[in-house]
Amino acid sequence: MIEIVNVTKTYRIGESSVKALDGVSLTIGQGEFVAIMGASGSGKSTLMHILGLLDVPDTGQYRLMGKEVSRMSDDELAGIRNNVAGFVFQQFHLLSRMSTIDNVVLPCIYSGQRGDFRKDALKRLEMVGLAQRSDHRPNQMSGGEQQRVAIARALIRDPMLIFADEPTGNLDTKNSHEIMRILTDLHRQGKTIIMVTHETDIAEFADRVITMKDGVVVDDRKKQDARLNPQMPQGGMEAAHSALFQPSRLLGFVVQAFQSIASNKIRTFLSVLGILVGVASVIAMMALGTGAKASMEEQLKSMGSNLLSVRGGSAKIGGASQGFGTVTRFTEKDAAAIQAIPNLIDHVSGDVTGSGQLVYLDKNWSTSVEGVDYDYGEMRAAIPTVGRWFTREEIQERAKVAILGTTVAMQLFGDADPVDKIIKINRINFRVIGVAPAKGFAGPRDQDDVVYIPVSTAMYRVLGKLYLDGIYVEVSSAENIAPATQAIDALIRKRHKLAADDQDSFNIRDMTQFQQMLSATTQTMSMLLGSIAAISLVVGGIGIMNIMLVSVTERTREIGLRKAIGARKGDIMLQFLIESVGMTLSGGIIGIVVGVGVSVMLSAFAGWAVKTSMFSVVLATGFSVLIGLFFGLWPARKAAALKPVEALRYE
């Protein structure tokens, strides 16, 4: 069954080297019970590790069931260990966070097979007399009971080979004999047992005793009454490993990952806290940015689309500005001439502004008075939500009618309907015909603190102005803004006899550019806020990586155990990645809840415009998962790269 020829193994310790095995050759038949003895440093444990496929020889041949295994890959050896061998260790190597039955089931996770593993585990526990303690943790059991659990674990895959490394080394005489009784029974059932011990009385339970010294076999004797009851191979050495991402396999890894996470609650919480804060910051910051953007979009709608603003320039005498309109003064005829430009212009409205004192009964309010034309309502999204807009006749007749902004309406009328009420504007009676839609603030200015009246009424009855303060022009399309600007510029220069190089007499402002600038600014602020929050996510990810590296160091023996019972490199890496992603995802989910809560509080108590978007939730969640993958990769690779024998020896 087992044949090794001229096997050598040398360990390097600093600059010196120690030859643990020096040309060892031996054959072990199927169904034998072999004890390997020797003093400390004799090479017996090294031989056991090579026979158990936990280590590979430097030179020589190792044939197991007729197949050369000494040059197989790590994953191939893992498959054979899982399918053919069972291990019993001196230190038991039970996982303290798992119950007895879960410890026994552990090798089945890496088998790639399906079945009622817990039922099989209970049978194995019953064989060793511990079925009634299947739900206990290792720390609730004696040393002898823990070793019996380890034997049950070694038997769960029904292996042909049992490797027992000092199985009684940490037990008293009574428990030692109990363990040896179990091993003897297994031998009678046909198992091939290879045991390392330094105790002569324990070695006497075996049918064959191999003694080693200084890396060579010095004695190999069999009992006269040795009996072989070989177990027939059940499927040979073919590993039953399945695809790494098989659903049942992944589920087992996920369950174990969260068991590991839950076993260190405080440390896990502190690790997750960084991700939690990062995700909550991303959600809250992006909610602020999205809310600001939505608020800005509402304000931009109130400004109208494809809009040009034509204003008189300011003359300069001795470098001093003389004020707007001192050079070029626009009249209603200028507005009409602009309206007549063919194929480019949709709407035009003259505009005059001033201040006014409004009075209704015992209430008064100082506000801005804006005289506008018929088309202004459509151009600037000012059509009343309550009441109506001016008619052309009212503008021609200089009618004393007014449309109130929502702030003015609230100050004068509260919740009452102001339509058809009579108010005074600068001591002149006006009839309220409507309330304009709310526009909000544009910077520090309240756009709803205004009263609209016909431009003719404002000029000749209220403000006493002979000229327009400006002209608003709505261009037919965004593509026509440039040609419309050129046409208006040429028209004004012609009408007012201005030189081609005169840049001070008037200006044409493209409100679309202003809108784009505001949108770009808002977008930049949103990105800046999101970037700042993302930094905290990265810092949280570094914290996760640090904890995972510590976890790899602390769990080195566990990693060695998992590899000994059949875990491949990919299995180890995947489990640690799942743990890392599990922590970041948990932090991400809690962070989403906290972030949304903070956003709601900012909106409710600070009055800030916030809007939580699904995009920010998906982004934060996805980013937290990526953080877990990225920062968990190094610890996972480090864990996967550990050699089984080195990991099991780790102190």
From Swiss-Prot:
Bilayer disposition of the protein: Multi-pass membrane protein
EC id: 7.6.2.-
Keyword Translocase appears in the UniProt entry: yes
Gene3D superfamilies: P-loop containing nucleotide triphosphate hydrolases (3.40.50.300)
Keyword terms of this UniProt record: Antibiotic resistance, ATP-binding, Cell inner membrane, Cell membrane, Membrane, Nucleotide-binding, Translocase, Transmembrane, Transmembrane helix, Transport
Enzyme category, top tier: translocase
Predominant location: membrane
Transmembrane segments: 269-289, 532-552, 589-609, 614-634
Family matches, as InterPro entries: AAA+_ATPase, ABC3_permease_C, ABC_transporter-like_ATP-bd, ABC_transporter-like_CS, MacB-like_ATP-bd, MacB_PCD, Macrolide_Exporter_MacB, P-loop_NTPase
Protein location: Cell inner membrane
GO CC entries: plasma membrane
MF term (GO), any: ATP binding
SMART domains in alphabetical order: AAA (SM00382)
GO biological process, one term: response to antibiotic
Domain ABC transporter: start-end pairs: 2-239
Sequence positions that bind ATP: 38-45
Cited Pfam families: ABC_tran, FtsX, MacB_PCD
Similarity comment text for this entry: Belongs to the ABC transporter superfamily. Macrolide exporter (TC 3.A.1.122) family.
Quaternary organization: Homodimer.
Function: Non-canonical ABC transporter that contains transmembrane domains (TMD), which form a pore in the inner membrane, and an ATP-binding domain (NBD), which is responsible for energy generation. Confers resistance against macrolides.
Protein name (database record): Macrolide export ATP-binding/permease protein MacB
Organism: Chlorobaculum tepidum (strain ATCC 49652 / DSM 12025 / NBRC 103806 / TLS)
Gene: macB
